[in-house]
Each structure stands twice: as C-alpha cells, then as structure tokens.
Amino acid sequence: FILLNLQGCNAERNNKKVFSQPELYTLNFGVEGEKKFKSYMQTGVDQQPAGMSFFDLTWGPPHLANIKIDLGEHSFVIKNAFSAMGTRIDYAQQNEGIQIIDVTAGLNKEEFVSQEQAYMAYKELFGQLQKAGWEQYFYPNTSRIAKQDNIKSMIEDGLIIDPYNFLTLTEWTDFFNKKPTVAVRLYNHGIFLEMSIDKTKSENDKKQYMLRYSMETIRYNTKNSIKDGYKLSGQELKTAFNERMKYNEKQRAKFENQAKKEGFHIDESYQDPDVWQYVK
C-alpha cells in the first residue's frame, strides 16, 4: 500500500510538471505543414465538398497550447491557444498542403486581467512580431493610410497601421473603453497575417481579451482573388495576374481619394511587396 501510494504521489508530481508549462506545437505551411497537423490530430481530416479540407486542433483550459508558427528566422510563438485549424485547397492542380492557418488564443494566460496586464501582453506580442521581421501590410486595393493617422484609423476603421509605434497605456485604455476590437495586417516573405484583439467579457474591473489569427500564403490569397486563379497557369495566369493588379490600382486610387476627403493622410512611399514570385 505504501509503495502504491508513493507511486501515485510521484505520478501526480510528474503530471503537475508536465502541465506547469504549456506544450509547444510547431505548425507551418505547405505539404510539410499538412504532415505536422496530422501528427498532432486526434480526429480525422474534415473534407468539404466545396474543395477544402480542414485540419483541426483544440485545447481546453487550463491546459492551453503554445504554438510556434515555424517560418525560419520569421517564426513566432502564439501563447494560450484554444484552437488551430489548417486548411488545404483541394481544387489546386496539385497538393500544395496547408495554405491557411487560423488560431484562436487568449491575450493573457489568465481569463480576466487588468488593463495593465493586457497592455503588457500586447507590447510583448507586437515586440515579438517586430523582431521576427513582420511588416505593415495594406491590401493592394485599399488605401495606404499614413502612420500619423494610426489612432484615427483604429477608431474609424478598426485597423492598426503603425504596429510598432506602441500605444501608451492611456491610449490602449482609452481605445478599448470606446471600441471592443482592433486588427492589424502584416506580411512576411509570402505569408499574410491578419490578427484581431477582441475585448469579449468583463468581470468586476477586469477584462477578457481574445486573439484571432488568420494566416494565408500570399499564393492562395492572390490566386483566390483572380477568376479561375487555380485553373490558370503559365502566360494565362501572368496575364490574369497583371489585369488584377491594374484593377487593384484603380480601386486604391478611388479609396485614397475618399480617405483624403475624410481627413486621412496617404503614405505614398508604401510599396506593395512583389508577390508574383509566390503566385507563378
């Protein structure tokens, strides 16, 4: 009995050790990314008739996951993850593996936190993305709002457009007292990331903040914006791509004229990244 009891205590201690640090899951894109998802999955792949397959991972509190999005020197870690879903595009001409990764996570480990705790977690998160080389991104058919209008953009459009000029604690608090959500769009070597910070619940003076990450290969993002983008190849694809870029330019000019009328400044120096290398 004493021996069994000791074994039970040791097992309990070992379990506590295991769960004291969240497990790190490494996820990435492409065929390699598909293998990674499958290696962690407890359920089968959800294949949909619309031509997409979904690879689901879920975790429940208190044992949330840490997820490393493995992009070499541009990698970053998402803490306190509740779920991750990889998407494969089955109507591609050949298997290109995971093209979209969606992750839901808590901004903080604790469910409800003070404004100060949330603010420190926001700074740590954005600092990590800055260090990994993620840059501000504008859709090619939208306005290139100048950094000086960051707060105006956050309040009117719900978008951070100067991600690494960190808000002050007062600016953070003032914003979330007025609005429940804000998003940022970033780009890094063929991967597009949109992340939102959502204030979801309150308890006494404390708040809950959720993070939603949507990452797409720029190959998928661009081909999906072109009619029959996944059916075309070679010169046909190049022609369709160029036509799409011309359309985007016209749309951007229209939206930027409107933005100026609304008191926004335009960042003429912003250049769209060269994405053709990933699309062809």
Predicted regions and their residues:
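Stable alpha-helical elements in mature extracytoplasmic
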Residues: 21, 33, 37, 118-128, ...
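Amphipathic, interaction-prone secondary-structure segments
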Residues: 49-54, 59, 69, 174-200
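C-terminal motif of bacterial Sec signal peptides marking the signal peptidase cleavage site
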Residues: 6-8
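Broad, structure-driven detector of short, well-ordered beta-strand segments within folded domains
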Residues: 76-96, 183-184, 189-204
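Compositionally biased P/S/T/G-rich terminal and signal peptide-adjacent segments
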Residues: 18-104
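A cross-kingdom marker for long, charged
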Residues: 215-280
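Long, charged/polar, surface-exposed segments that mediate recognition or autoinhibition
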Residues: 86-164, 179, 206-242
